[in-house]
A protein has these predicted regions:
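Sec-dependent N-terminal signal peptides
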Residues: 5-13
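C-terminal segment of classical bacterial N-terminal signal peptides
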Residues: 14-19
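Acidic, serine/threonine-rich low-complexity disordered tracts
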Residues: 21-124, 161-255
Length: 255
């Protein structure tokens, strides 16, 4: 299994950023929450993930939210070690991203060691993203549509802003520093069995996308939210060319 592809798919479904004119804590979309997930393959845990929605920040006359994702390896020993972190800072009103920070730290017995920090700065006024990797002199400029999301701000928009009960398709342009994707998430209401809640009514968002690591073969991303007004993201499934993996919700904590 290619862990890198699993990680890319996870951050598609789903470090503080400093502002030069100062910042302060402001009210976010309710108390901050941390969602903890486990991904298993053949019943064995392979990845642990935590997804945290932070209360907003305020600076330069605007309010912002932050979403943080941490993904680590589970019980893989010397075969593979991962401790990757991702942070998205976005405008509170629209969830349009301001910055997306990737901190990659992983290595394995048969994998190349990767340790780098990359910052994506979104500039919707000029329809571009500036990509800067720590230690590199060059700053890449990538042209994107005005309303382009990173993977975490996409997740936040679905969680905080979208009316999933309308069952309308959600169309988004997403850029993660690797490639620009046009994705359509199709909602569907259904009952599912969950680890911590039992059987619940849920809304499933489903989108098809291609994966460069599999010769651009298509895979499917599914996210289930509880259909109870809270929209708790209880399950994420990756249907990849190499098979399916599920990230199930284990626990929710207040931050």
């Amino acid at each position: 299994m290619r862990i890198r592809v699993l990680l890319l798919a996870l951050i598609l479904i789903g470090a503080s950023v400093a502002y030069p004119h100062g910042q302060r804590s402001v009210s976010g979309p309710g108390p901050g929450k941390i969602f903890f997930y486990t991904a298993k393959k053949f019943g064995v845990p392979i990845l642990k993930a935590s997804l945290q929605f932070e209360n907003g920040l305020s600076g330069q006359g605007k309010s912002f939210y932050q979403v943080r994702l941490q993904v680590s390896s589970a019980a893989l020993g010397v075969l593979f070690r991962m401790n990757n972190r991702f942070t998205s800072t976005m405008e509170a009103e629209t969830c349009v991203p301001v910055q997306y920070v990737k901190e990659i730290d992983q290595e394995g017995l048969f994998k190349e060691k990767k340790n780098y920090l990359e910052t994506l700065t979104f500039d919707p006024n000029h329809q571009r993203v500036l990509v800067e990797k720590k230690g590199d002199q060059e700053i890449r400029e990538v042209s994107v549509p005005a309303e382009t999301f990173d993977p975490l701000s996409m997740f936040a928009r679905c969680y905080l802003k979208e009316d999933l009960s309308s069952h309308r398709d959600i169309r988004m342009t997403i850029y993660d520093g690797l490639r620009l994707r046009q994705m359509v998430f199709q909602p569907k209401q259904e009952k599912i069995k969950t680890r911590i809640y039992g059987e619940v009514e849920a809304v499933r968002l489903e989108a098809t996308t291609s994966f460069a690591s599999f010769e651009n073969k298509e895979g499917v991303i599914r996210i289930w939210y509880t259909d109870d007004g809270k929209k708790t993201p209880i399950l994420m499934e990756l249907d990849l060319p190499i098979g399916s993996v599920r990230f199930e919700l284990d626990e929710i904590r207040e931050s």
